[in-house]
């Protein structure tokens, strides 16, 4: 669980502790990293391969923690590749501290320091240093002895002096080597003991003092005995020096002084060696004996200021202690209370591990952290843990576990629980006391084995979202509409055959009951959108709406040449306008009476209910005001249907609607029922603006027309939005003589979700211009043919000079006028045809007048 520290990122700047090496210089995962998610603190233990949670995993946060912004992390797990801009400053500070420590170690002979540092060469992988507190008497004796040795060494030149100098150089070289090793060596690995982490802490933090607890009396006695032996040795050496100086003559003082210096150095070196072997191995002896309990005293204010200025590491007041039995850090009640007032954790993620249970110790720590969101998904829980100990929980996620029962007793004791997610388990039933979770708002138990729902589920009056999809439900509770606050319901992929009353669900926004076995659909959903109907129709200009209706009604009307026929058409249009206004007002009044005006339904998904063949009439009134996702295709005009792929794979619905032809506008799809229906496929059809779909217009229009005459035709693509709608619009422009805007409005009124892509729209506009030009050319050609016929008739009338000549010419002119009127009536579909027909009629009348004059 520890971290591997590298020297490049300031690896020796942190101190190990707890279950993993902490510190600010690292590039991997930190055990004490807290992610700041917009003011909400998050701990991520996701995908760590944990089989059991231990208290020391969380006790590291009692010692120190580091708050990291989410934008400084690269991946979404919040645990890798943290930015380490601050590590350079820390590494430089640590290097300066190490240099100052080395200088202090070299100058201990001249400085009157209380703390003495010594080094040893041990067999461990990391060098060790200790901080000892010496009594004042021993310090004075050491100072006097060291001063004597310095003077004697400077005055002497014997082989003993050279040995002493060599010994000092060796010790200095050892210090240099060890200090350089400290600079380049990483922090102890996670496999090393907790004692080594404290040793590295002593190496890097020289201001710390070490005290021993009263429990370790044996160690105290040993240290006292060592100090007494050192004091006795120093006293004996001083007495020998005084006696030798008094006994010898003045003539031999120099020689005696030299000899005394050598003899005086020996006990000093011996004392130094004893001090190395007795005082320092307090940590080395711990390899064979039990380690001593130690407590590190830290200045809270200074450390917090330094941490906030340099690295975002925050150190609480009380740090962890080392356990002498197992060598692991533990926490006490005081540290927990201090952490509780220091920081609060909003969410904890323990997903994608191998957890089977959570002990009460861990749950009590979670309670002290006041965790609100707990994620335990993708583990091996067979029984829900005792989460009632964490009273602050608001969200619990137990997705992808091995739960077979829903133990509501655990969640009833959580007063703040609002969201419960139990997806992808093996739960077969919901207990009757589910309504005791009073504040539950979001409940998701999808992809389980539920077969029925208790009636008490309807008592969850605060429930907003309910997801029970992908189960084995066949019915819903009869009082299901008592859940008056429901806004989103997902019941897809079940076996539901009928629905209860839904009239009270006035706050419902989304209802998904796709992929079931519905036999009928209640009309209650149509009455859950009356408020939107009122609002939408109150903003509609009825006269403007009537103009659009008139354009559709006048599609198949013929333009008569006489003024009487025009007046009759205007009268008929006025009657149609009055009827349309009355229909709109009747629809608004009917919805006001039946609906109540409180619904807000936006989407109803009834797709893939193969037994559901028809919809109630009420849904026709609101199909443009809500998104109705269904497998039933939309009927644009009688005999022409528009839909998606789900409409084409339901043979019973197609046969019920009388469809015989299917136009398939998908490049990578084969016909579903080639033996039952007649297909026309566009193999390379792509929903892309650069694709030229206009090259198929002439052929598809002929196929649609033949299918409409034979019974019905379905035009579909994958979603029934772009490709299929483009083909239907082109057909309406060609055979129903509509403009692009008229055809687009008509199709969109029948199927609101259609939307041809911009490239297809441009192609339809070009096709409109092409059709307009061809119509004009056809009209002009008809007029020229009529003129030729009139001139030939005039020549015949001139040659006939009989008494009834006038009557014959009048009859011929009347016949020609009748022929022109019938031809023009067949071609009068565009806005320009009335003018052209009038011109042709005028020309024919003038020709007849000329005939009359000529005959006279």
UniProtKB/Swiss-Prot annotation:
The keyword Protein transport does not apply. Coiled coil: none annotated. Residues 1-10, 90-142, 178-195, 224-243, 306-323 have a biased composition (Low complexity). Keywords: Hydrolase, Leucine-rich repeat, Lipoprotein, Myristate, Protein phosphatase, Repeat. The keyword Zinc does not apply. Residues 11-24 have a biased composition (Gly residues). This is MAP kinase phosphatase with leucine-rich repeats protein 3. The lineage of its organism: Eukaryota, Amoebozoa, Evosea, Eumycetozoa, Dictyostelia.
